[in-house]
Amino acid sequence: MNTEIHLFRQARETRDLAVGESLFQVGDPGETMFAVLEGSVELRRDGQCVETVQTGGIIGELVLIEPAPRSLDAVAVEPSRVAIVNEREFVFLVQEHPTFALKVMRIMAERIRRNSGTPRQA
């Protein structure tokens, strides 16, 4: 996703996170996704890291496809800045940059595969 980070650099809304600061927690309502502009954010389940998302990565994209409460905790592991992307902005990006949509789908598929224990097909 690093090649698309330029799409988020001019985001209308950003948030700075200190080390250990929570971006969201399990059960929080999910209405936005985030793009990591700087730093690293861990995705955790029951306090255990399931993925570290670094500069250029995205977090929380699933709620823009299927609205639901957050299923993981997201915590900054170094000083970080994230772009906040709402549904309207997400739809615009998908329509204007079809390769962005494909990359989001690949990220989602990889996360689903990793969490289900399904091996990757060749």
Short names for language-model regions:
Residues 1-122:
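Cytosolic regulatory regions built on CNB/CRP/Popeye-like sensor folds
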